[in-house]
């Protein structure tokens, strides 16, 4: 008799998920559900708060896009994982069709790539705001923000389509059991019949475009910011700006660090359990923390959130300094 991984899904795959840990399924379900609801609520609240502002600074377009990306990002992966964890019949793996798997991978890469470019654009915004404050309004215009936001999405989409086509043109034979809880690139590469380094070239190219180039821009922007802060004579202002940038960098490194460790390594070092652990952080913790930290360090956003929640303090002035973002 054929094994389930070979015979039950002839035109698709089986997502193993966390089926080898049946005793942890209820705990994982409750934990993921709580984080997922917090992520949805936090990002939706940011979108509503920005939409409620009578006048919005151009940079807030980036924040709205970041929240929207994280919202979609978590919806691509987490709901299906929750269903799989709550379904007793999926103890050996959850079936997913070939096209559904390709679509999930493409959307995951597109949204993740758009976020990588967006974080670089936001780093450039902070560079202009801190290093050239008098020219900020002339440089960072609503038109520039809109063009950068659109470019981030289009570049992420272009890379994701090319990578998805390359991965799903590989021959898959033998077991169709994906050792992951979603259709991840490394898990799919592990199932490919061939073991040529050429199979990994599309992933390497995508990593160069999505990870290396934006990270260089981010490091250059923050390097210039650090140099400018050292020349700042006001200790209070320098400390406040430095703490804000440190938080932004921490979230950025969490995003890039997980992605780099997961994808910038040879196929021979593939570790399913480690990849799934990192993916849990990458798909659940980062979408929760990233928009909140970027938003709550800005007075304009916190004032809008207070208005939405009905907790605005008497005498609290709306608006704030963009350099706090």
From Swiss-Prot:
Q: Kindly list the GO molecular function terms attached to this UniProt entry.
A: G protein-coupled receptor activity; olfactory receptor activity
One annotated Gene Ontology cellular component of this protein: plasma membrane
Could you tell me which Pfam families the record lists for this protein? 7tm_4 (PF13853)
Q: How does it sit in the membrane?
A: Multi-pass membrane protein
Q: Tell me yes or no: is Secreted among this UniProt entry's keywords.
A: no
Q: Which compartments does it reside in?
A: Cell membrane
Q: Which residues lie on this side of the membrane: Extracellular?
A: 1-26, 79-101, 169-171, 222-243
GO biological process annotation, one example = detection of chemical stimulus involved in sensory perception of smell
Q: Which domain of life does the UniProt lineage start with?
A: Eukaryota
Which residues are tagged as glycosylated in the record? Answer: 6
Against InterPro entries, the record matches this protein to:
GPCR_Rhodpsn, GPCR_Rhodpsn_7TM, Olfact_rcpt
Please provide the record's keywords in A-Z order: Cell membrane, G-protein coupled receptor, Glycoprotein, Membrane, Olfaction, Receptor, Sensory transduction, Transducer, Transmembrane, Transmembrane helix
Stretches assigned to the Cytoplasmic side: 48-57, 123-147, 193-200, 265-325
Can you tell me where the transmembrane regions are? Answer: 27-47, 58-78, 102-122, 148-168, 172-192, 201-221, 244-264
Question: What this chain does, per the record?
Answer: Odorant receptor.
Family classification: Belongs to the G-protein coupled receptor 1 family.
Its name, as the record gives it, is Olfactory receptor 10AC1
